[in-house]
Amino acid sequence: MSEAQLTTEPTDPHSLFRSWFAEAKASEPNDPEAMAVATVGADGQPSVRMVLLKGHDARGFVFYTNYESRKATQLLETGRAALLFHWKSLRRQVRIEGPVSKVSPEEGDAYFATRHRDSQIGAWASDQSRPLDSRATFEARYEEMLRRFEGGPVPRPPHWSGFRVAPERIEFWQDRAHRLHERRLFTRSGDGWSEGLLYP
């Protein structure tokens, strides 16, 4: 990373993330908000899957899921997660690690109300991560929920809401020629952040 970059890029990781995310939304052809969420179970087995970022501010990074899913079970067991954004068009990655907490019921309700009605119905129809005997069974449950909520609003299911990852470490990675990549690490320190570079 050049001295010019060090002095012109934001020194607050949340500001830097907003800057990079804005560039990704302008250049990434598919789902710039897609991120990998890594968790680990009580048995030590790691697990990873893609979700969509639905909120970001100084408190952390928010995504939504079924609280009875495998990912939610592991998050509630350990209270920690790692996130990864990979924007191929920019040849950049952002890695985030930290503790996890549930969003407030009010936040969950507000976000659920913005979802397309079909997605709201789907949240009621799916027993996420549980065995399914056939696609027909799932589709029948969906039709059942359509009838149940016909003509009225669809409330947020009690088992469906969000998690917030409060970052303790945020690393920004930029591809460079000759594998001389740039790695800029922010580590939470009290109410602020310490910053440094890493060898690639």
Curated annotation (Swiss-Prot):
<dbReference type="InterPro" id="IPR019576">
    <property type="entry name" value="Pyridoxamine_oxidase_dimer_C"/>
</dbReference>
<keyword id="KW-0288">FMN</keyword>
<feature type="binding site">
    <location>
        <position position="115"/>
    </location>
    <ligand>
        <name>substrate</name>
    </ligand>
</feature>
<dbReference type="GO" id="GO:0004733">
    <property type="term" value="F:pyridoxamine phosphate oxidase activity"/>
</dbReference>
<feature type="binding site">
    <location>
        <position position="71"/>
    </location>
    <ligand>
        <name>FMN</name>
    </ligand>
</feature>
<feature type="binding site">
    <location>
        <position position="119"/>
    </location>
    <ligand>
        <name>substrate</name>
    </ligand>
</feature>
<keyword id="KW-0285">Flavoprotein</keyword>
<feature type="binding site">
    <location>
        <begin position="128"/>
        <end position="129"/>
    </location>
    <ligand>
        <name>FMN</name>
    </ligand>
</feature>
<dbReference type="GO" id="GO:0008615">
    <property type="term" value="P:pyridoxine biosynthetic process"/>
</dbReference>
<feature type="binding site">
    <location>
        <position position="173"/>
    </location>
    <ligand>
        <name>FMN</name>
    </ligand>
</feature>
<feature type="binding site">
    <location>
        <position position="111"/>
    </location>
    <ligand>
        <name>substrate</name>
    </ligand>
</feature>
<feature type="binding site">
    <location>
        <begin position="64"/>
        <end position="65"/>
    </location>
    <ligand>
        <name>FMN</name>
    </ligand>
</feature>
<feature type="binding site">
    <location>
        <position position="183"/>
    </location>
    <ligand>
        <name>FMN</name>
    </ligand>
</feature>
<dbReference type="InterPro" id="IPR011576">
    <property type="entry name" value="Pyridox_Oxase_N"/>
</dbReference>
<dbReference type="GO" id="GO:0010181">
    <property type="term" value="F:FMN binding"/>
</dbReference>
<comment type="pathway">
    <text>Cofactor metabolism; pyridoxal 5'-phosphate salvage; pyridoxal 5'-phosphate from pyridoxamine 5'-phosphate: step 1/1.</text>
</comment>
<protein>
    <recommendedName>
        <fullName>Pyridoxine/pyridoxamine 5'-phosphate oxidase</fullName>
        <ecNumber>1.4.3.5</ecNumber>
    </recommendedName>
</protein>
<keyword id="KW-0560">Oxidoreductase</keyword>
<dbReference type="InterPro" id="IPR019740">
    <property type="entry name" value="Pyridox_Oxase_CS"/>
</dbReference>
<dbReference type="InterPro" id="IPR000659">
    <property type="entry name" value="Pyridox_Oxase"/>
</dbReference>
<dbReference type="Pfam" id="PF10590">
    <property type="entry name" value="PNP_phzG_C"/>
</dbReference>
<feature type="binding site">
    <location>
        <begin position="49"/>
        <end position="54"/>
    </location>
    <ligand>
        <name>FMN</name>
    </ligand>
</feature>
<comment type="pathway">
    <text>Cofactor metabolism; pyridoxal 5'-phosphate salvage; pyridoxal 5'-phosphate from pyridoxine 5'-phosphate: step 1/1.</text>
</comment>
<feature type="binding site">
    <location>
        <position position="93"/>
    </location>
    <ligand>
        <name>FMN</name>
    </ligand>
</feature>
<comment type="function">
    <text>Catalyzes the oxidation of either pyridoxine 5'-phosphate (PNP) or pyridoxamine 5'-phosphate (PMP) into pyridoxal 5'-phosphate (PLP).</text>
</comment>
<feature type="binding site">
    <location>
        <begin position="179"/>
        <end position="181"/>
    </location>
    <ligand>
        <name>substrate</name>
    </ligand>
</feature>
<keyword id="KW-0664">Pyridoxine biosynthesis</keyword>
<feature type="binding site">
    <location>
        <position position="70"/>
    </location>
    <ligand>
        <name>FMN</name>
    </ligand>
</feature>
<comment type="similarity">
    <text>Belongs to the pyridoxamine 5'-phosphate oxidase family.</text>
</comment>
<comment type="subunit">
    <text>Homodimer.</text>
</comment>
<feature type="binding site">
    <location>
        <position position="54"/>
    </location>
    <ligand>
        <name>substrate</name>
    </ligand>
</feature>
<dbReference type="Pfam" id="PF01243">
    <property type="entry name" value="PNPOx_N"/>
</dbReference>
<dbReference type="InterPro" id="IPR012349">
    <property type="entry name" value="Split_barrel_FMN-bd"/>
</dbReference>
